[in-house]
Regions:
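Short, solvent-exposed loop/turn segments enriched in Ser/Thr/Gly
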Residues: 57-63, 154-156
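Acidic, serine/threonine- and proline-rich intrinsically disordered appendage/tail regions
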Residues: 167-211
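Extended, solvent-exposed segments with strong compositional bias
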Residues: 99-146
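Low-complexity, acidic Ser/Thr/Pro/Gly-rich terminal tails and inter-domain linkers that flank the onset
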Residues: 32-58
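Membrane-embedded hydrophobic alpha-helical segments
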Residues: 3-36
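A short tyrosine-centered beta-strand micro-motif
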Residues: 134-139, 151-161
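Short, hydrophobic/aromatic beta-strand segments
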Residues: 72-82, 91-101
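Short, solvent-exposed beta-strand/turn "edge" segments of beta-rich domains on protein surfaces
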Residues: 49-59, 68-76, 130-132, 148-150
């Protein structure tokens, strides 16, 4: 009887040791994967983008969150931001430039005080800025182009962040889906809001127009 109890103990001990080894392996793999990522800077895309057309110029408003991952005490200098958009067809994509940084403000219609609109105001020219863990940045950046060619479909895009500490940029890929109604809406005054969480329209994690 004592031998049977000892057998159960040994079996259980071996099983527990195996589980512990597996857990250690999982954590080791996770830590290795984390080590392969940039140890200092993290860039997170927002839930919302905004598009505006003014004649031949199309602007995309992006507000990423840029912060340092660990409390290293280091200061990161962001030296440049770039936006690339690849159209649904095989043609060349529009060439965007970082026009400026803006801020969103709420305004009331003087003829109807209960009507509130949201518009942007100039905040600053494009320029390098510093990021620390204590002070993450969420700039509203306006990227503009005069080469936008209207075409319905999925646009694959990349936001690139360049830094002073390394030549390796941080790139965040995302996608934007437009149909014919979206293209028509973009030609109207004002801006259109695109979100990644629009009910029944967020397939693939892409941004869809929120109407």
């Amino acid at each position: 009887m004592a031998e049977l109890g000892k057998q159960h103990f040994r079996t259980g001990h071996t099983w527990i040791a195996s589980i512990a080894s597996l857990v250690a392996l999982v954590f080791s793999g996770y830590n290795f994967a984390q080590a392969q990522e940039d140890p200092r800077t993290v860039v997170t895309m927002p839930l919302t983008l905004r598009l505006n057309r003014d004649g031949e110029k199309v602007s995309v408003f992006v507000q990423p969150t840029i912060a340092t991952r660990y409390d290293t005490g280091d200061v990161e200098m962001v030296t440049g931001m770039e936006l690339r958009l690849r159209p649904p067809n095989a043609g060349p994509g529009p060439e965007f430039f970082w026009e400026d940084s803006v801020r969103w403000v709420a305004t009331r219609d003087p003829k109807d005080y209960d009507t509130i609109g949201v518009w942007w105001q100039f905040e600053s020219d494009p320029a390098p800025f510093m990021v620390t863990q204590e002070e993450p940045k969420q700039p509203v950046m306006r990227f503009s182009t005069h080469g936008w060619k209207d075409a319905p479909g999925r646009y694959d895009a990349t936001l690139t962040v360049r830094r002073a500490s390394t030549r390796e940029p941080i790139e965040r890929a995302f996608c934007l889906v437009m149909d014919s109604a979206d293209i028509t809406s973009l030609k109207k005054p004002g801006y259109d809001e695109y979100r990644r969480d629009v009910p029944r329209r967020h397939g693939g994690g892409c941004y869809h127009r929120y109407a």
